[in-house]
């Protein structure tokens, strides 16, 4: 099952993000919604923005923040991807591994 088969999930993600993100970040919201509709694995979701949207952002922390918080919140902390079953800790580790970002750096960004 991919996100493209779950329009309600995509809609819920959009509402969740719009409530928590300023209007200046609308492009990033749209990027996530588009990515959700185009991917069926966690790895695809993490890599897609590198090739498309993320190039226009100063760093990857914003994307990590959205993936970790928005996805897991909307999906009740669990989702059965084609490549794995994930929870918020796994998503965090997976995304930070892809971007080669240390946990301390991310926590500093969030604080």
UniProtKB/Swiss-Prot annotation:
Belongs to the asfivirus E111R family. This is Uncharacterized protein E111R. It comes from African swine fever virus (isolate Warthog/Namibia/Wart80/1980) (ASFV).
């Amino acid at each position: 099952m991919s996100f493209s088969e779950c329009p309600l999930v995509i809609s819920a993600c959009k509402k969740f993000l719009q409530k928590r993100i300023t209007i200046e970040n609308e492009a990033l919201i749209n990027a996530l919604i588009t990515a959700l509709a185009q991917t069926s694995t966690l790895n695809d979701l993490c890599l897609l923005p590198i090739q498309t949207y993320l190039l226009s952002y100063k760093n990857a922390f914003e994307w990590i923040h959205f993936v970790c918080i928005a996805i897991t919140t909307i999906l009740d902390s669990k989702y059965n991807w084609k490549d794995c079953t994930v929870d918020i800790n796994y998503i965090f580790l997976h995304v930070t591994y892809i971007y080669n970002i240390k946990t301390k750096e991310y926590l500093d960004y969030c604080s």
